[in-house]
From Swiss-Prot:
Gene that specifies this protein: rplK
HAMAP family assigned: Ribosomal_uL11
Record's subunit section: Part of the ribosomal stalk of the 50S ribosomal subunit. Interacts with L10 and the large rRNA to form the base of the stalk. L10 forms an elongated spine to which L12 dimers bind in a sequential fashion forming a multimeric L10(L12)X complex.
UniProt xrefs under Gene3D superfamilies: Ribosomal protein L11, C-terminal domain (1.10.10.250), Ribosomal protein L11/L12, N-terminal domain (3.30.1550.10)
UniProt-listed InterPro entries: Ribosomal_uL11 (IPR000911), Ribosomal_uL11_bac-typ (IPR006519), Ribosomal_uL11_C (IPR020783), Ribosomal_uL11_C_sf (IPR036769), Ribosomal_uL11_CS (IPR020785), Ribosomal_uL11_N (IPR020784), Ribosomal_uL11_N_sf (IPR036796)
Name of the molecule in the record: Large ribosomal subunit protein uL11
Length: 143
């Protein structure tokens, strides 16, 4: 028989930097899960990634205090800011532009995000990324 699921926990954890401090500790502790076991497993899985890159993770907690977790791709906004070389988006996105993004950069981000996007093909994914960039006040060239 399958294990009984008691809940899901959604967190954004920096790659390679999971530790028992908030927000991880309290979220897992409430469900009675082994915090250090998750931290070690997460850090091992994110070893090859850029340290500090926020990784969304969905933890499935089971009744027997065990768990599994699924890592998603980093948020599009983080990847866009990194590619455009800006610290944060514009306060007035449609009037003040803070950076530029080329089509090649948008395609690279779309390829990274493809597993989590609902886009039908790469072109649709690129347009989705371009729309996110525009809403952050970043000009997109070639789209």
């Amino acid at each position: 028989m399958a294990k009984k699921i008691v809940g899901f926990i959604k967190l954004q954890v920096p790659a390679g930097k999971a530790n028992p401090s908030p927000p991880i500790g309290p979220a897992l502790g409430q469900r009675g899960l082994n915090i250090m076991e998750f931290c070690k497993a997460f850090n091992a899985k994110t070893q090859g990634m850029e340290p500090g890159l926020p990784i969304p993770v969905v933890i499935t907690a089971f009744a027997d205090k065990s768990f599994t977790f699924i890592m998603k791709t980093p948020p599009a906004t983080v990847l866009i800011k990194k590619a455009a070389g800006v610290q944060k988006g514009s306060a007035k996105p449609h009037t003040d532009k803070v950076g530029t993004l080329t089509r090649a950069q948008a395609e690279e981000i779309a390829k990274t995000k493809e597993p989590d996007l609902t886009a039908a093909d790469l072109e649709a994914a690129v347009r989705t990324i371009a729309g996110s960039a525009r809403s952050m006040g970043i000009t997109v060239e070639g789209i």
